Amino acid sequence: MIQHPTLPHPTNKLAIIGEYPRKEELAHRKPFVGSGGRLLTIELQARGLATEQCLLTYASQTSSLSSWDNATNATYRDWLMSEIDTYSPNCVLLLGQHALRAARPDLCYRTRPTKASPSGWRIPVDNFRGSIIPGFDGRHKCVVCYSPEDVQRVYTNIGLFKFDIARAVSESKSLDYPYKSRDDSYIKPTFVETIEWLTRIRDQKPKISVDIEGYPDDIGITMFGIAISPYQGIVIPFWIDGDNYWQHDEEVQIWSLLATIMADGDIAKTAQNLFYEQFVCMWRHRMVIANFTEDSMMKHYELFPELPKGLGTVVSIWTKESYYKDERTTSDTRTKLGYNFKDITYTYEAEEAMDPMMDAYPKSSDHYRFNMKLAPPISFMNIRGCRLDQDRLKAHKDAAESELDDYQLKIDSVLLDAAHAADVLTRKRKSDPWAFNVKSTKQKQWLLYNHLGFKPSARWGPKTDDSTMLRYYEKSRDPILRTVIQAVRKRTRLSDIEKLRCDPDGRIRTSLNLCDTGTSRLASRESMAMVPLLGKDGNVLKWVNTGTNLQNVTKELRDCFVPDTEDYDFWQLDLEGADGWTVAADLAALGYPAMLEDYLAGIKPAKVLMLMLAEYEAKRDPMVINKLPIQELKKLTSALVIPEGRDSQGRSASWKYDACKATQHATNYDGKAETISAILFKRSDGLVDLTKAEAGIYQYLYKLRYNPQYRTEWIADVLKETGCIQTAIGFRRKFFGMRSRAYVDPQILRTAASLEPQANTTGVTNMALVNMWYDPTNRSSTGWLHVEPFLAIHDALAGQWHKSNREWGCKKLHHWFQNNLRIHGIDVSIPADGGWGDSWKTTINPLLT
């Protein structure tokens, strides 16, 4: 199937090869007339090109990749190549797996068949999309892209699809390849060349791009790349092919010069994810890197927070270089060194290529500059870590195991005989006792779909994940299903405890990153620090990362996080109301000021909801609360005491207040009643068990006073008009996943509703961290911090100070947290409150003012 151009374009000559014709194409005997073709047509037209101006055809006649090499398909591909040669396009757009395999079979290889790739062929469209490569035996310039049908299935790829279509249209204006000449003469330098290069950088102080290869293990950095432009750079090998590259005295001189350059605050530096370079250099080699002025990952994230942020993606969008990241694992020494050279020069080019677009969005530029200023204290926290009390941690683990044993006894007493009769039980050893395994998918499937008789989803099949079990529990309220869910949650808690792995110095670390969420929130994951994993014989099996996500540490476990010694206090300060202030300002701007007035009066909306709920439960009119004067309402909410400890059912005594807070946040973001019920159930390990109807009452009462639904409607209108959300803090997000401006998908709407509150809260917290870090009065004569930050948790900071600095530190914390925002014309200063104690959990002593 082929369609030749009927309206030749005066400058562009593009051939488009799809995967294979679908039903609509076969019915009409015309390429690209189905839904995927319509998506392609829209994107081409947006770039000034019509499908009638292109050669349109397919790489295969069928969807099967398994029959690729049979005689019929081979004959078809010969015909295809002949047609392309005859048309002689300036560029060929390869859409999807079949097209890439037809143009570059050398890039494809056999692998083990999987559900995602049943043919057993690995065709790396994900890697090569956006790349400009020679194809069809080198005769034609090609651009690789996802097929429009794949994009429709995974619509999060629409942003990359748009970029790649634009690239193909641009490249169809000329036969020329856009490759740039780069001087890689110094990827395996001599000692003299290395010293000359480093000396010149030290003395002339050019802006440099930095990239390291290696890990913070027993070897450390294996090669260190430095570029002085997008075209020139040096790669300094240290450990190549299992051996040292330099003599000992030579390496000492090189490291000394490198350390001088890296610590020089007058030498501007850029990187792709500077946090890794800083951590490995400081942790493994005790080398400080100062004055990172740019970061290609952070800049790219600022412009397109929804897109992948790895260097492969960054290079594919901001340069015209083809995919190269697989060269990292090559066994060829020169290719491996060349890979590091590409990293540093491509990073340099990509970072500078973003400047024109960044200049077009001044607020985004300001936010990016702020994040670059924030990077040093983030790196400090990544390195510093926090002391962990191992005895307390063990006590928590023992308690969790005991509770899990209790759940197991309850489950086995009800299910064991039936499960045994159904022959679904397994055990590792014959000597092991029989037990129902709540980790086993097979056994949970039996429980849900055989024993309890639920009907599997027609679309997803017999799933057993947490949300599925919660959904069935919502329907049945079956007590044994609840116990199984509680056991699963307790296993998760136990796993969380086991992930709190310390480094040899007794401190736990995390890896904070500014670019891992779509809302500019700090992300936390396992630390970049590594320790050896030993086998039974005492030999090192491999090196593994320590630490974990510390933002999800439960309140119960926070007593394990302690200051360095008894001479220090642990402190925490968090924003009061946090995300709610942005919602309140939005509603006030829309003409619904109740929430903002409450916040300004020091009234917490969750406490107001508790009062309204009490009226409802007493069968009185909850609207009475809404009619109260603001001062009377403040007296009532101030008199509400939130209990501590556990109630008679084992629930947190504050569960009702927690439910009101969950209702506030979920309803602000267009969450539904069942979402609130599920959140509370999960957080409490099944102890707080509101029905959907009960959660709906909470929501109804909340809306009765604050009207958050009108903010949701306004956000939907903004998305329909612009497709973007601009936050007061400067962060901007374009929602590529919107299929139409006429309709906003509910999930996108919920994401957009939470975006600015989370971004603003994070921004204000980060402002406090920046104020703390750069305040000269917070430094000793040696440069050490009087008030140290250890942890960042969305709307809070925590750390330590010496007890002698307690009064001074309290005043300073309040000062650092005083930051103003203008949200839709309304000036807002989010108040902060906190305390200090002998652990993170016990920061209950009020901060002095």
PLM features per residue range, with description:
Residues 90-97, 209, 266-274, 572:
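Acidic beta-strand-to-loop metal/phosphate-binding motif
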Residues 397-426, 430-431, 435-437, 698-715, ...:
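Polymerase palm active-site segment centered on the conserved acidic dipeptide of motif C
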Residues 376-379, 383, 455, 505, ...:
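Conserved catalytic core of nucleic-acid polymerases
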Residues 76, 80-88, 197-200, 248-267:
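Short, basic/hydrophobic alpha-helical segments
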Residues 170-244, 318, 326, 332-336, ...:
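Conserved "right-hand" nucleotidyltransferase catalytic core of DNA-directed polymerases
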Residues 140-143, 149, 172-189, 222-225, ...:
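Active-site-proximal helix-loop-helix substrate-binding element of RNase H-like nuclease domains
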Residues 51-52, 293-295, 392, 429-433, ...:
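Short Gly/Ser/Thr- and Asp/Glu-enriched loop/turn motifs at secondary-structure junctions
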Residues 1-177:
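A polyanion-binding, active-site-adjacent surface
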